[in-house]
Design a protein with these regions (language model features):
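Generic structural motif recognizing short loop/turn segments at the entrances and edges of beta-strands
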Residues: 1-3, 151-152
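Loop/turn-to-beta-strand initiation segments
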Residues: 33, 102-109, 136
Length: 180
């Protein structure tokens, strides 16, 4: 079985790109066979590539076709969810992921971006995907809130959502904190 990690965020601009660069760099020190997979990408135009995927593929010269790195465009996944076809989304994601397992020793799975009003659905869907892929979860959050309790609350909600779904949360990274 391929090792994996599901990287998810609590909100936009948490520093997911930086964290994914660091994790991939560490992984490549241990194995040359690292893959990247984003179950759902938020590109509106199919001609524009996902910036997180593209960054990792180019920076580390990963041996993957771009088309193999994702399962759905966000708009298509939202349409299917609206039709009550969440199971189809999960099944397709599993199928695409399984196709990568034989090619890589480790797959970094990157969750969706939370950049629109459907983000409440995204947390739940990310948790379902992580659970069904059997991937441990690393949560990335922002620390640039007015009160520490606000940061704690956001992290707690994400943590509870994933653990209540049956996922193993292996850690939390809080970026953009005030050093004071």
């Amino acid at each position: 079985m391929t090792n994996s990690l599901y990287l998810t965020t609590t909100e936009p601009r948490c520093g997911k790109s930086l964290v994914s660069l660091g994790i991939t760099n560490l992984l490549l020190r241990r194995t040359g066979r690292v893959g990247v997979f984003r179950p759902i990408i938020d590109q509106k135009d199919t001609l524009i590539r996902d910036k997180n995927i593209e960054l990792l593929l180019e920076h580390f010269n990963l041996k993957m076709d771009y088309e193999d790195t994702f399962a759905y465009f966000e708009r298509d996944a939202i349409d299917l969810m609206g039709q009550g076809k969440t199971d189809l989304i999960i099944d397709t994601v599993i199928q695409k992921y399984k196709a990568l397992e034989s090619r890589f020793d480790f797959i970094l799975i990157i969750g969706s971006d939370f950049e629109n009003e459907e983000s409440a659905f995204e947390v739940e869907l990310n948790a379902q995907i992580a659970k069904n892929l059997g991937a441990p979860v690393l949560i990335v959050s922002r620390g640039d809130k007015e009160k520490i309790s606000d940061v704690q609350n956001v992290v707690r909600v994400a943590y509870d959502t994933f653990t209540n779904t049956g996922c193993e949360v292996v850690g939390v990274i809080v970026n953009r904190t005030d050093p004071e």
